[in-house]
Structure formats: structure tokens, C-alpha cells
């Protein structure tokens, strides 16, 4: 029995047997069908979330290159660049969401529906090459990290995540003949989720600032999601490369790069604004020595335009 959601006819047959015979076996069968239906719904949500996270991680892997192309001062002076729309980054993020849904229902769901009849991959060398190619995709992100002179913690967490994903990919490759296709998917997703939760726990339990936590969380999950997605796709060798979908994939990734870059830039602007507000609230020694007349004179002589961000 597969993980597909039972159709209306199948449910009627099961419940008809349940009411006709009244045996516990039929009751157990109906319970199993219901549980499998909920498992399938959960699987749909997980696959869509995985595709979305893969696109976001691929975008984060090349975010550093945008800071070399576009000057930071120009981007800060134009929050809605290049459309001059304030909410342009948030609106553009809806495109990857719709893209993930389209890719799932167009390509992933038919494969999942036929995985019980899918032939076992008999090209171990090609699987190994694809796994190594997915792992070598970390090198550009690692180079961007070094070029941007990120803190040592970011580089360390990224390298550790690379090592962990390499071990996970090797385990999946070794166990490909000892378990079924669904068991391999379960193994990959289980290891992926566990390592991701451990990574989040490490990041948010350290006494770091929020910008550093966001940076660590982004860069350290890039390799994990990249390797997880590639190790899933190598199980379906004929679905890894889709020439008819190259243009669509390139477009959605490019839009994701731009939107996430401006979102992170907006987070940085908010951090700068909060730091400026904290500096304004801190009492200085010179301000404590001023008299009330001096303070009123200074406030009246200061134009309001200088106080606006």
C-alpha cells in the first residue's frame, strides 16, 4: 500500500467492509488508510517547503556577489531599487513560492505517484558523479564567504555543515541497495531535519548579535539544503536534468537572488536605525553638563530635516 491519498472509491470499499463484517481487521485497515492519508498530506507540505528552502539557500549562496556589483550606498539610498517600489522585495518573494508549487505539482508529484513502479537506478557511477557535483557546489559559496571577510564563526559553521552533508550523502549512496526508494527518502529527510535543528539550536544559544545569527543561519544551511536536494534528485537520475525547464529555473532563481538580497539589505538598514536610536538615547557627559537653556537653544536651532533618516 503506497502513501497516496485514498480515493473516494477506495474509502467507500473500506468503510463498506467495516460496516458489513464488523471485524477488527477491517477497522484496522480503515485506520491505516486514514493514517496514510494524513502522512501523504504531511509529505506534500514537506516537499513544497523543501523546494522553497532549496531556492532560498541557492539564492543565499550567491548573495555576496551582489555587494560587489551594486554599491551599498546606492542601494541604501534607494529602498525600492530597481522598481522604486517600497514593497518590491516582499512582492518578488511570492514568485519563488509560486514557482515551488509549480515545480512540485508539475514534476515532483507525478514521480512520487509512480515511485512504486519506478525502476531502480542502475548507474552507480553517474549517481556518485552527481553527488560530488552537488557537494562541489559549496565551493562558490565558500569563496564568496571568504571574499566578503565574514567572521570566523560563519566560515567554521559552513565548513562543518559541508563535512556533515558529505557524510550524509555517502551514507545514502552506500545504503542505496539495502533499502527501498521510500526508505532512502525517509533517511535523507530525517538526517536533513535533525542536522538543521541542531544547527538552529547552536546558532540561537550562543551569545551573538541578531545580524550574526541570521548570517550564520543562512550560510550554514546552504550546504545542508543543497546536498539534501541533490541527494534526493540522484535517486531519480532521469529527473535531475530537465532541459525544457532550464529557462524557468534560471528565471525563478534570478528573481530569488534579487529579492533576498534586498530583504537582507532592509534588515541591515533596520539594524542601523536601531543602533542610531540607541546612540541617541545614551546620555553623554557633555549633555549632562548643559543647562536647560542650552538644551532649549540647541533644540530650536537644529533643523528637523537633519533628524529624519
From Swiss-Prot:
Identify the keywords attached in UniProt to this record, alphabetized: Glycoprotein, Membrane, Transmembrane, Transmembrane helix
The residues that the database entry marks as glycosylated are 178
| UniProt keyword Membrane present | yes
Cystine residue pairs: none
**What is the predominant subcellular site recorded for this chain?**
membrane
Q: Where in the cell is it found?
A: Membrane
Cellular component GO terms, alphabetical: membrane
Q: Which domain of life is it from?
A: Viruses
What does the record list as coiled-coil region(s)? none
- Segments spanning the bilayer are 50-70, 85-105, 128-148, 154-174, 185-205, 210-230, 245-265
Bilayer topology annotation? Multi-pass membrane protein
Q: Which family does it belong to?
A: Belongs to the cytomegalovirus US12 family.
Q: What is this protein called?
A: Uncharacterized protein HVLF2
Q: Which organism is it from?
A: Human cytomegalovirus (strain AD169)
User: Gene name, please?
Assistant: US16
Amino acid at each position: 500500500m503506497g502513501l497516496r491519498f485514498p480515493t473516494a472509491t477506495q474509502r467507500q470499499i473500506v468503510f463498506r467492509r467495516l460496516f458489513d463484517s464488523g471485524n477488527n481487521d477491517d477497522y484496522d485497515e480503515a485506520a491505516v488508510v486514514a493514517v496514510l492519508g494524513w502522512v501523504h498530506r504531511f509529505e506534500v507540505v514537506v516537499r513544497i517547503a523543501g523546494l522553497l528552502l532549496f531556492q532560498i539557500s541557492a539564492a543565499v549562496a550567491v548573495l555576496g556577489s551582489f555587494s560587489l556589483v551594486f554599491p551599498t550606498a546606492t542601494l541604501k539610498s534607494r529602498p525600492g531599487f530597481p522598481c522604486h517600489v517600497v514593497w518590491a522585495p516582499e512582492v518578488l518573494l511570492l514568485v519563488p513560492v509560486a514557482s515551488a508549487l509549480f515545480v512540485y505539482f508539475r514534476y515532483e508529484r507525478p514521480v512520487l505517484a509512480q515511485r512504486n513502479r519506478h525502476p531502480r537506478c542502475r548507474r552507480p557511477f553517474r549517481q556518485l558523479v552527481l553527488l560530488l557535483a552537488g557537494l562541489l557546489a559549496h565551493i562558490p559559496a565558500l569563496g564568496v564567504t571568504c571574499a566578503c571577510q565574514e567572521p570566523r564563526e560563519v566560515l567554521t559553521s559552513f565548513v562543518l555543515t559541508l563535512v556533515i552533508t558529505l557524510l550524509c550523502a555517502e551514507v545514502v549512496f552506500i545504503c542505496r541497495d539495502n533499502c527501498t526508494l521510500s526508505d532512502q527518502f525517509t533517511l535523507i529527510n530525517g538526517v536533513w531535519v535533525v542536522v538543521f535543528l541542531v544547527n538552529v539550536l547552536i546558532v540561537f544559544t550562543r551569545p551573538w548579535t541578531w545580524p550574526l545569527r541570521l548570517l550564520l543561519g543562512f550560510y550554514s544551511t546552504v550546504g545542508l539544503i543543497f546536498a539534501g536536494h541533490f541527494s534526493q534528485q540522484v535517486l531519480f537520475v532521469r529527473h535531475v536534468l530537465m532541459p525544457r525547464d532550464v529557462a524557468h529555473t534560471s528565471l525563478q532563481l534570478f528573481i530569488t537572488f534579487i529579492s533576498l538580497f534586498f530583504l537582507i539589505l532592509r534588515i541591515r538598514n533596520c539594524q542601523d536605525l536601531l543602533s542610531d536610536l540607541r546612540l541617541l538615547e545614551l546620555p553623554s557627559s557633555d549633555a549632562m553638563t548643559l543647562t536647560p537653556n542650552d538644551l532649549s537653544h540647541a533644540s530650536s536651532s537644529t533643523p528637523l530635516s537633519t533628524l529624519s533618516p
